Each structure stands twice: as C-alpha cells, then as structure tokens.
UniProtKB/Swiss-Prot annotation:
It is found in: Cell inner membrane. The chain crosses the membrane at residues 2-22. Residues 23-284 are cytoplasmic. GO terms for biological process: division septum assembly; FtsZ-dependent cytokinesis. Belongs to the ZipA family. GO terms for cellular component: cell division site; plasma membrane. It comes from Pseudomonas fluorescens (strain ATCC BAA-477 / NRRL B-23932 / Pf-5). Residues 47-140 are annotated as: Disordered. Interacts with FtsZ via their C-terminal domains. This is Cell division protein ZipA.
Length: 284
C-alpha cells in the first residue's frame, strides 16, 4: 500500500504535536524545580531572629550563678566548704575569724639565717557556748610555715607611710600582736589567710609613730594548718609580696634568705599539696 502525501502530513503533524507536548511537559517540570528552588532561597533569606523564633521557640531565662573566685583582693567565704573543726564535727565557725595566735617571733634581720616562727593556728570562734570553752592549748602548733621576706634595696629601708599605704592596698589590716593580717575580705572580715611582721625584733609595728617608722625588711608568713584554702591564700600572699617589692624597691627572699624564684614558689606550692595529702591520710 502506497503512502500518499496526505498520510505523510498526518504522520508529520502527529510527530510535531508530540514534540510540542513533550517540550511543554519538560518545561513544566523545569518550572516546578525553579519554583521550589526560589522558595528555598526565600526561606534562607529570612531574618535570623524570625527563623530562630519559629524553629527554636522563645528563649528561656535561666538563673545564673557565679562561682566565687579567688583573686588577690578577696577570697570566697560563703560558698566554699568549711574546713572541718578539730574539736568536733558538729561545731560551726563564726562569720568573723580570729587571728592566729603566734608565739615568740624571731624575725631579726640576720642575713646569715632566716627568721624562725613559732605559730599557733586557732579555730575561728563559734557562737555556741560549748565551743567557747576550748582554750588555746587545745590547738596544735603550725607544722609548717611558708615565709616570703621582702628586703629593701635602699639603705634607709621601707618608710612607714609608704609601707602602710602599700599593704593596705593589698588588703592587710593591722590586728593582733601589733602586726598585719590578710583576711578573706579586704574589709578585714573572715578567717586570716596570712600575716606580715616586721623582720626586726620584736617584729611589731607602731601605728602611733608610723610617720617616723622605717624597717629594712618585712616578712609575710602562712602557717599550715591554717586557712581553709591554703593554695589560694598562698597565691594572694605572693601577689602582696610582689606588689610591695615592685613598688617600694624591694627584693623577694625565701625562708632561707635566698632569692625567691619561680622554682621556689612552685616548691612552696608542692609543700602545701603534700601537707594536704598527709592531713587527708591522717583523717582516714
């Protein structure tokens, strides 16, 4: 059977129509893809706060709690665990700490030998009358004393007014035994962290005559057992001694009157760690 012109036109028409339909279908699919792509981009361009509000929900307000940190100005006195009293596990410490009672001070400025201390570490006074009945003789003497001396490079020594101003800025306050003590608070409240004595016998300061006072050296000392957090208290003591030496032209010395180095300071810290380890072992 021969295919005439009419049949060829019909076949060509069908092919053209099919091509048009296929092209239209392809364009429709391509248009859907583009529409979806534009929708996604429009969502990505939304402001951050609106997107966060829809996806994450409203922000919650959380209570914040700052952990106390110890620096060279104040030590925390409330949130830290209290050191276990020696007389009984049920006795409480009072808000204000008493200065440590120290025995004879041998703080003569003899460069051949370091100062010797006989320190006593008292528990803080408590409000209960039964705790008040304990006497000082029940308190053991300090097993170790960490000493940092500051020797003036000037022949005239540390002048009283300048020395007083410097140590007051470091938080030391004049107290028992006529020497200076650093408490937990700059205001002089809380337990005693460390003390500072005159390196010349009898080791005291006369505030009434401070304008005419001078000394060739002073000694900072921290007894163990002593403050509840001895490592932190020691860091505060080092900061106070450094401030004094830098501002008043002094030189730092250790308990052997050798130059205080970073290695010596680290050795002091290791002594504190070792003491705490022994104390913990004895409690078990």
């Amino acid at each position: 059977m021969e295919i005439g012109l009419r049949e060829w036109l019909i076949v060509i028409g069908i092919i053209v129509i099919a091509g048009i339909l296929f092209d239209g279908w392809r364009r429709m699919r391509g248009g859907k893809g583009k529409l979806k792509f534009r929708l996604d981009r429009s969502l990505s361009n939304l402001p951050d706060d609106e997107g966060s509000a829809e996806l994450l929900g409203p922000p919650r307000v959380l209570d914040t709690h700052k952990e106390p940190q110890l620096d060279e100005h104040d030590l925390p006195s409330v949130s830290m665990p209290a050191r276990e009293p020696r007389e009984s596990s049920s006795s409480k410490r009072g808000k204000r700490g008493g200065e440590p009672h120290q025995g004879d001070l041998n703080l003569d400025l003899d460069l051949d030998s370091g100062p010797s201390f006989s320190s006593r570490d008292d528990d803080f006074p408590v409000e209960e009358s039964k705790s008040a009945s304990h006497s000082d003789k029940d308190q053991p003497q300090a097993e170790e004393v960490l000493v940092i001396s500051v020797i003036c490079r000037d022949a005239a020594g540390f002048k009283g007014p300048a020395l007083l101003q410097n140590i007051l800025e470091s938080g030391l306050r004049f107290g028992e035994m006529d020497i200076f003590h650093r408490h937990e608070s700059m205001a002089g409240n809380g337990e005693v962290l460390f003390s500072m004595a005159n390196a010349v016998k009898p080791g005291v300061f006369d505030l009434d005559d401070i304008d005419h006072f001078s000394t060739p050296a002073v000694s900072f000392f921290l007894g163990l057992p002593g403050p509840r957090h001895p490592k932190q208290a020691f860091d505060v003591m080092v900061a106070a001694a450094r401030k004094l030496s830098q501002e008043l032209n002094g030189e730092l010395k250790d308990d052997q009157r050798s130059v205080l180095t970073a290695q010596t300071i680290e050795h002091y810290r290791q002594r504190i760690v070792e003491f705490e380890r022994r104390a913990l072992t004895q409690k078990r």
